[in-house]
């Protein structure tokens, strides 16, 4: 049986996959607003609790699982029945907005939903777990074996009916042609008399002087398993190199996560920006006792780039991706997942446009052997305590 766990369908996230890949301002405001997604952390938590409970059973009743993202049910549910085909009863899908058309019901990206393929004899067992976690659960379809994927309305009309091979067959290759634009920069020359000017420029960087931590006063110990949050020391300054969460309430093991990014360096050298981003994410985990050292760590790369905005920008992205790949291969660290937003350009009616600096944000995470042995980046108020500066750049300048 095909099962959906999570919230209702709304006119949200329509065409999100396409709009996120074009310049802001290219489409009408109505189209862009419909593509906006939502966030419902409570529903996400409920659905996650159900999935976790099923995974922790001795016999997992889940045959296949897929999250809802771009293209909504079309993408999510079709992935579940790719090998055999399936029929979805649209009358069983939860509708939060009665004015939705068939297309909007099928393709909206209202998130916090999971699609699952579950054996028929396990349906009632899964339903009890969903009721316990207060997660809405709907049996919306079944596998068919005819290698077609279809949505059928209550009146028998099928607004969507395609052969599976038409959906998952080999798509045509897209070739993008760009030219490498050589840019050269002189070594900066500093004058001690301009120290305050340099300091002002550095403090304008959001990554350096953002004051959100003063206003975002939220519960930083949700679930009670947060072993290290962003504020450290007596003054509670946001100095944490990494975040740490315990795996349970009694044990010592946990998970550490950190991030790294270097958009300023990437402006001058995209390859250096990628390497520095990975380096920052990894060095932020230096003082966390990883269970198996670097073998415990996996990375996620989020590419934020203004592709096709100007000549040479696509070539810069290629250079950055290749540099990150080569660097991680040399370190023998995997990058199993990631995300991209390749339309980081804002266009205005008068023809002006603003492009974002090409950036890769690297997230690192892995298992800790002991959450209590993570070293805090807080200086000891002791005159005899040495402070070392280790220069990883090896720059003689």
Can you annotate each of these PLM segments?
Residues 1-397:
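Glycine/proline-enriched, intrinsically flexible loops and inter-domain linkers
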């Amino acid at each position: 049986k095909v099962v959906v766990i999570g919230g209702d369908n709304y006119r949200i996230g329509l065409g999100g996959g396409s709009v996120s890949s074009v310049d802001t301002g290219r489409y009408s405001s109505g189209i862009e607003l419909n593509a906006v997604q939502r966030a419902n952390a409570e529903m996400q938590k409920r659905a996650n609790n159900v999935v976790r409970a099923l995974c922790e059973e001795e016999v997992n009743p889940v045959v296949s699982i897929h999250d809802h993202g771009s293209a909504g049910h079309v993408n999510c549910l079709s992935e579940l029945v790719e090998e055999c085909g399936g029929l979805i009863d649209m009358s069983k899908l939860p509708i939060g907005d009665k004015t939705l058309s068939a297309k909007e019901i099928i393709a909206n990206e209202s998130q916090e939903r999971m699609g699952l393929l579950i054996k028929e004899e396990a349906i009632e067992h899964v339903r009890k777990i969903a009721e316990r976690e207060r997660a809405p659960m709907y049996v919306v379809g079944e596998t068919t074996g005819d290698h077609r994927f279809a949505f059928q309305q209550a009146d028998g009309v099928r607004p969507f009916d395609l052969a599976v091979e038409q959906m998952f067959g080999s798509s045509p290759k897209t070739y993008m042609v760009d030219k490498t634009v050589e840019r050269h920069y002189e070594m900066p020359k500093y004058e001690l008399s301009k120290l305050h000017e340099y300091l002002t420029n550095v403090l304008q960087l959001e990554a350096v002087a953002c004051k959100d931590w003063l206003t975002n006063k939220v519960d930083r110990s949700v679930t009670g398993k947060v072993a290290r949050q962003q504020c450290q020391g007596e003054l509670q300054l946001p100095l944490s190199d990494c975040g740490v969460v315990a795996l349970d309430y009694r044990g010592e093991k946990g998970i550490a996560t950190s991030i790294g990014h270097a958009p300023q360096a990437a402006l001058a050298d995209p390859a250096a920006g990628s390497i520095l981003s990975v380096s920052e994410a990894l060095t932020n985990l230096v003082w966390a006792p990883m269970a198996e050292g670097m073998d415990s760590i996996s990375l996620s790369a989020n590419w934020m780039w203004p592709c096709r905005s100007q000549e040479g920008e696509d070539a810069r992205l290629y250079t950055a991706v290749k540099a990150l790949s080569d660097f991680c291969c040399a370190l023998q660290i995997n990058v199993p997942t990631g995300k991209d937003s390749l339309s980081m350009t804002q266009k205005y009616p008068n023809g002006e446009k603003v492009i974002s600096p090409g950036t890769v944000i690297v997230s690192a995470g892995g298992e800790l052997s002991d959450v209590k042995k993570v070293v805090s980046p807080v200086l000891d108020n002791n005159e005899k305590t040495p402070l070392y500066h280790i220069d990883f750049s090896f720059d003689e300048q």
